[in-house]
Amino acid sequence: MVPAKAKKVIKVILIILLAAVLIVGGYVAYVMIDYHRIEDNQALQINDTTSDAALVDTEYKVISYNIGFAAYTPEFGFFMDGGTQSRAESEESVKNVISGVGDFLKSEAPDFILIEEVDKNATRSYHYDEEAALRNMLEGYDSTFTVNFDSPYLFYPLSKPHGKSYAGMLTLSRFNIESGLRRSLPIEDGFMKFVDLDRCYSVSRVSVSNDKELVLYTLHLSAYTSDGTIATEQLNMLINDMQAEYEKGNYCIAGGDFNKDLLVDSGKIFGIDGADYTWAQPVDPTLFDGTNLSMVAPFNEEKPVPSCRNADGPYNDNQFVLTVDGFIVSDNVTVSGSDVYDLGFKYSDHNPVYMTFKLNG
């Protein structure tokens, strides 16, 4: 016969276990019910400041920069990459990073800017509107903003949950953006879809003086996959879209974070073994077979600089680095140069990349 005192202890334990099951079950139900994909072929709002058209046979510069929601200072290691941190250090730190990013971009004065991982309203960045702040700093540009992360509240890590995020990609152009469109990409089918971004690319149609269009694509392809299969499917969709635009006579430039090893073997180039980082697979060159498109991987053979660090802890000289940020161009775009800015990962786990080019007349 079980003593009365023991029965009470067992009862309390069972109540605690039941409460825990109900809490966890309720949270899982909340995440699954709240989950949704953002509508495909969604027209984007254009912040219109200019009616100027881009010119042919004129050199322009485009910069792509994944700013890591303004959290990835050199001391930051992200929990999903093997680090411990889930939020920016503070709101003040977020503002300082955005200010630094804006100052850098203003000093370079590119004609086009593609920015990934920009928070509008997120727990992880203390609800600071990074998109509005950057637009206010970067005057004289038309712009579009494309949402690719509208997540439920992620209650992990328990000590400081990542929280809820509303974020996306910002595209800026010194020339008139006629229209903008959001295209949804294939994503993971399993659990990862609940914590990964709602992958997409934006399509911004820029006026050109010869009555054609420069079709500008801003992208952030999938990471956290075991073999890069989904990212390849995403890339294939983008290539097909760009090829169709080229065949209409338009100019095409895509840029952003491909989450692929654009240098094929960054580990060898930068002297740090990347065998354990299977998400960073090279781009399959056969994807471009039969197309009028080519990959542009930012690289200086004499002084190679990586565009990304694996944020499994604070930045250090032994951390795995690679180049995942770059561009795709159509054959009627002549590229004169492309490289990585060596900012030492001061503002993000990415360094910005650039490409100079001309639209062929």
Task: Give the label of every model feature segment.
Residues 192-193, 313-318, 342-346:
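Short proline/glycine-enriched turn/loop segments at secondary-structure junctions
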Residues 136-139, 164-180, 318-334, 358:
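Conserved beta strand-loop-helix elements of the APE1-like EEP
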Residues 150-214, 218:
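A well-ordered secondary-structure block
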Residues 84-90, 118-120, 185-193, 220-229:
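Surface-exposed cleft-lining segments at the edges of enzyme active sites
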Residues 2-137, 145-166, 361:
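N-terminal, active-site-proximal structural segment of metallo-dependent hydrolase catalytic domains
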Residues 61-67, 100-127, 172, 204-206, ...:
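Active-site beta-strand/loop signature of hydrolases that rely on acidic residues for catalysis
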Residues 166-169, 197-203, 321-326, 349-354:
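Short hydrophobic/aromatic beta-strand or adjacent loop that forms the aromatic wall/cage
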Residues 226-331:
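Metal-dependent phosphoesterases centered on the DNase I-like endonuclease/exonuclease/phosphatase
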